[in-house]
Swiss-Prot record:
Protein keywords: ATP-binding, Kinase, Nucleotide biosynthesis, Nucleotide-binding, Transferase
Record field: catalytic activity: dTMP + ATP = dTDP + ADP
Gene: tmk
UniProt keyword Transmembrane present: no
Transmembrane domains' residue ranges: none
Gene Ontology terms: biological process: dTDP biosynthetic process; dTTP biosynthetic process; dUDP biosynthetic process
Source organism, top-level taxon: Bacteria
Protein name from the UniProt record: Thymidylate kinase
Functional note: Phosphorylation of dTMP to form dTDP in both de novo and salvage pathways of dTTP synthesis.
NCBIfam families: DTMP_kinase
Amino acid sequence: MSKGFLVSLEGPEGAGKTSVLEALLPILEEKGVKVLTTREPGGVLIGEKIREVILDPSHTQMDAKTELLLYIASRRQHLVEKVLPALEAGKLVIMDRFIDSSVAYQGFGRGLDIEAIDWLNQFATDGLKPDLTLYFDIEVEEGLARIAANSDREVNRLDLEGLDLHKKVRQGYLSLLDKEGNRIVKIDASLPLEQVVETTKAVLFDGMGLAK
């Protein structure tokens, strides 16, 4: 058993996970919580190199299984190099995407076999799952509109996908929510950022047993 607490942030494109995390960090630090924030794909040098390959807008011919295996490879390296040591040190680790993204994007979105994805996730993580997953839910059209309106956000290959894929991804997340409601908590990401941050803070503090 790890000593720390692992939280993953999940959601469709444009749900605002990163903005919420940026707002939460000073609140957690004020509480004296030792926290590590990181992202998938990426987080470490090898992972970031793989991220570049996955998200390069010019890589339009990437096969779905190739995409999945690249994510899994990045996940493994990230885990052993950064996440596990932080958990062993007793830190709160907050990951911007983790195992559920593979199920939602490559499983539901790309139509790959869910059982195969579950096996690969198990293989890459040695069975590690988040203690808590915060799922930021938003209508697909609204999320993509946010991306289009944000000139500072770098457009990646997944942003260029058709509406159909993104709708399947959201359905994948909602399916995971039904299946693992004890781990995954749904947060309405369509609300103003301040409200989303407050809700997220309350859910996180409750999950960690921290005083609000």
